[in-house]
């Protein structure tokens, strides 16, 4: 699901299922079959349905480094002990997943972010797959069905029917909540702030063209300002970068961190 160079993004292991498996194993180490019967609803799904869903979800947990299996017995990795909520899980998963630039989920996200404006004109996921293929990334249709569940959860946008609206607000907000590089009230030059963002979120790097920020990053910065998390400054004597075009001024020279 998340491995470098392995095209195995599938729709079954949605975030809530992977989280449920992790939380059960955190409290109850055990054999694979016993864990499956404990976390799956046998009276709702057929045995084969449960097996596919569970196996993919368990594999995703292992690939994220949260669960380990030895001789068919599964237990919690140390990283799982600090995950006590879906927010904890989201922050950990985003950090792990986007460390892997050769994984299919990273490549789809990066390319979608780079060509975000084009992606918004499509009304079917098949069109998105075809378009990304035209930009050099070939992958099976089934992969986009898995991707569409994970990327909004990781904080990179909002799912609206058959389109993912690119907005990295949640992902950036998660980073700001735990960062120690900037002090409250500090006015940070936009160049420094973007370099920090791109180091933490390498999936957005290709969306920027010199000093022109891409749609997903621009949406995130505007949302952060609207939520009172940052203030976008326009100092006349400073180097100006540009947010993705919108009504009013799109120039920005500094980002002030909220107190």
List PLM regions with ranges.
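Donor-sugar nucleotide-binding helix/loop cap in glycosyltransferases
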Residues: 1-259
């Amino acid at each position: 699901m998340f491995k470098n160079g392995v095209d195995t993004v599938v729709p079954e292991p949605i975030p809530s299922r992977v989280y449920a498996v992790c939380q059960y194993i955190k409290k109850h180490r055990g054999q694979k079959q016993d864990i499956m019967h404990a976390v799956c609803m046998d009276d709702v799904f057929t045995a084969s349905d449960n097996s596919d869903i569970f196996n993919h979800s368990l594999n995703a947990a292992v690939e994220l480094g949260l669960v380990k299996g030895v001789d068919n017995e599964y237990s919690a990795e140390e990283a799982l002990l600090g995950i006590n909520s879906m927010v904890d899980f989201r922050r950990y998963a985003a950090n792990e997943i986007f460390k892997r630039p050769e994984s299919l989920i990273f490549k789809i996200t990066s390319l979608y972010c780079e060509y975000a404006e084009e992606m918004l004109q499509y009304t079917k996921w098949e069109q998105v797959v075809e378009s990304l293929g035209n930009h050099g990334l070939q992958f099976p249709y089934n992969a986009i069905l898995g991707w569409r569940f994970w990327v909004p959860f990781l904080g990179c946008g909002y799912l609206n029917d058959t389109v993912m609206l690119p907005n990295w607000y949640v992902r950036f907000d998660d980073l700001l909540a735990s960062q120690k590089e900037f002090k409250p009230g500090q006015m940070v030059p936009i160049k420094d702030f973007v370099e920090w963002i791109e180091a933490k979120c390498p999936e957005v790097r290709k969306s920027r063209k010199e000093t022109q920020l891409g749609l997903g990053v621009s949406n995130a910065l505007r949302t952060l300002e609207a939520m009172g998390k940052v203030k976008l400054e326009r100092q006349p004597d400073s180097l100006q970068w540009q947010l993705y075009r919108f009504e009013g001024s799109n120039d920005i020279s500094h980002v002030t961190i909220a107190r």
